[in-house]
């Protein structure tokens, strides 16, 4: 006979189900479950007296050789991804996601997609949220400790450039030349995250660019501090087209070599990743923002100006001066910094993100941005925009799924698509590396409970190692076994160009990590940006800097209070 329980009883045992809503942190956002893969009454749960025991939800006969037997099951998780908000079990094998569905023992249970056997471990996710590991595509590799800070925020992939604390690295996300690229590929062997490095994109001799792609760069960065001229940009794009890599552009703030229109004329119809498209991080003043209307531009913006608050403008001048090696005693340097900080375009940035005109969010780490705040600031923007603009079309009370899917895509699948790594990472889908972040809903967007990297727990909140239980204070982030021994190399990927991959860069440098080629980049357009592909007409008033979308002035009010802030950081 069947057993009936109340909704509250069910939720406390197995987590929310279809129609239930979860508040994300202390924001005003609610995720509503669209589908539950569980068979009611046959949910697989672990623990004393629970169902995952021998002969029950754990199959006693099968071995690991069965392709449907998981190494790890994340049970009863609420999965939030760019295309779904569902309740499901996640099956992981050999470090990769192989199934999303219902886990258990098919001998006695119905509709089992994932077999739990004697070789299977369990992460209990009842009442928890699971997301794909985040991808930050604007990283200045200045300090190796950035990787740990980012990991503890839910970021599992870094793309950018640098060689350490050099002036070039502090300013330009560039790893210049084969020697530096090889050294950074070797250094990545000791990092607990996936990485890809961008070379320097300034050269009229294509050989100087090609040798960097051959050395393993996944693309080229054209930056104004090295000279973002139309000529340099065009040459870099020529090489990118030949080798199927991405170009990242920090355009010409001073308009020395041309205006925004000249840059777009040099680009033609070729795809590129436009960094900090709002312009405070750099780029044609005051109208770089107009580039987001082009179908071949994949626009991102960076977290120092997100969301717009009453402190944003004041803090930026000093950041620009330090990052770009400017001299406060030189009036022209002060004018350069001032030209980038425009409250009107900053106020429009949040709205453009909310409309899906800007497709991605990244950090600009230690070069005006904060490497551990990409995810937090993304959800703060989403909260502010719901507060100011109301629900998105299709959303309603206690269901912000459309907005949630739009915003999570900005730091997961869209960066992966942009840089040619979406075959490997960027979403919770079968066939992808199991880079998975587990959140208590109360702490969503701020502090993950644990991070699974390549199928193994890499970082987790855990108590005193001498405690009698794992929750003995002090509870803090601690390295897990995914960061020890050979696991550092067996659970993370290093991304390289296809030509470097085919020529055996892993063997040439004796790399132990999983080395994978970037691919399918040059045919991209903004239409490929999930939930963030809008291309309206954009204009900027050259006198007032006001931003217009299809003729309508857009702006936002400076926030004086935000969620996901001080109540989460008392200690």
UniProtKB/Swiss-Prot annotation:
GO cellular component: cytoplasm
Compartments where located: Cytoplasm
Gene Ontology BP annotations: urea catabolic process
KW Ribosomal protein (keyword) present: no
Protein modification: Carboxylation allows a single lysine to coordinate two nickel ions.
Annotated positions binding Ni(2+) 1: 138, 140, 221, 364
Main subcellular location: cytoplasm
Keyword Nucleus carried by entry: no
Active-site residue list: 324 (proton donor)
Binding sites annotated in the UniProt record for substrate: 223
N6-carboxylysine modification, residue list: 221
Keywords from the UniProt entry: Cytoplasm, Hydrolase, Metal-binding, Nickel
Cofactor requirements of the protein: Ni cation
Transmembrane segments: none
Enzyme Commission identifier(s): 3.5.1.5
Comment on bound cofactor: Binds 2 nickel ions per subunit.
Molecular function as annotated in GO: nickel cation binding; urease activity
Residues that coordinate or bind Ni(2+) 2: 221, 250, 276
Catalytic activity as recorded in UniProt: urea + 2 H2O + H(+) = hydrogencarbonate + 2 NH4(+)
Pathway(s) per entry: Nitrogen metabolism; urea degradation; CO(2) and NH(3) from urea (urease route): step 1/1
Quaternary data: Heterotrimer of UreA (gamma), UreB (beta) and UreC (alpha) subunits. Three heterotrimers associate to form the active enzyme.
Family indicated by similarity: Belongs to the metallo-dependent hydrolases superfamily. Urease alpha subunit family.
Name of the protein in its database record: Urease subunit alpha
Naturally occurring in which organism (per UniProt): Staphylococcus aureus (strain JH9)
Record lineage: Bacteria, Bacillati, Bacillota, Bacilli, Bacillales
Underlying gene: ureC
